[in-house]
Amino acid sequence: MKRLFATLLSLGLATAVFAAKAPTHHSMRGESMGNAHVAVVDDKEAIYYNYAGLSQINRLGNYAKRPEQGYYPRNFLGDARLNIGGAGPFETYFATYNVAKDLQVLYQNVADAAEALGMNQNELLMDTLSSHPELIHKINSYDHKYLPMKVKFDAELAIHGFGGAVWVDGSVAPYLDGGLILPFLGVDTFYVDGVVQGGFAYGFTDNFSVGIGAKAAKRHKVEVITIDILNYASIQDTLEDRYDDATHSIFDFESISFGLDFGVLYQLTREFRVGASLRDVYFKELAGDKITPNLSVGFNYSPRFFNKNTGYARKFNFACDFADALNSDRNYKPLSHLNFGLEVEQTLLAWPGYNNELRALSLRLAGGFKGGYPSAGVSLEVLRVVTLEFATWAEELGYYTGQDEERIYMGQISLGF
């Protein structure tokens, strides 16, 4: 085991000179509990956090195969799901949108007045702004404030020892800039990531397993788009054109990058396990970016007293990770790497005579801290076929935790079993 950890560390250090962030899958379950998941991985989330966790499917909660963890809710079938979701900082988005609309009306009125009076439009605009300082205050309040919006689609399959996924993650980050004379709308880094990945896990013992996976990733991005506020109505057409370019380019296979993921998992005691993973070890640049591998270590605690493996099953996990250890952008404050959280999942309606595998209604609540910022989430599963999920977390846009928070709200609908 020490040799495996040493191998993971040496691979990570050898690639620590890389700089950019890899395509990131946003797991609703993981993000809601602070993204501390490298040692939880008891279902399909092992595909994204630690392939070694695939060895736990149909083992946790299985008295015949692993009696020590028989108290844990069993996942006999694994997972096969289709997910679609979206996210954004909606509070700031709507506020900034209203400011932009107000400015559009103002500039259109100024343009009409300048034409009617035969005056210079810029001079009349400056006079108008000087007589309405509240508008300048509004502009300054949202000057270069990013408003990232995300969309995601996943197709996932996970069974004991094997898992794979095809997923797409897209993001656009519009902002309002005060400008030197005229404010304008900008879009910073419009991108679409497409990833196909799969891997397997092997349990050497009931307590120790390793996992390895491969992935192919494609990224298309547009760095900067600027739109004059006087032509604000054209932003929708412009973004649609950029989106069409991105979605067509995503199937250009010449620029696909291939990578590997590694993971280990060890059940230290009956209720306590530790895990480590080195993910996103790419062999070439991705859309011109050198990718920083993600080295994460963590633990998970599942107390027997709070877990219940019956028809009315209950799952309780507390987890803590030191995540993305090689990311130099987060090393100014070491605690920005610290993620921790807990989750409680309770079956509310069960089918008489059946165990947790066939349930009518299940509720999951989670909370935690990701890099110092609070996270939370809720999900409702109906007949094990339809799951509605919501999560919120924050990303740091500055150099250290607390400097510039970006609050994300994401919703998702999931179909499958």
Question: Would you name each region that the model predicts?
Answer:
Residues 2-10:
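Sec-dependent signal peptide recognition
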Residues 1-2, 214:
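Generic cytosolic/nucleocytoplasmic N-terminal low-complexity/intrinsically disordered segments
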Residues 10-18:
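Hydrophobic h-region of N-terminal signal peptides that target proteins for export
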Residues 20-417:
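Subset of outer-membrane beta-barrel
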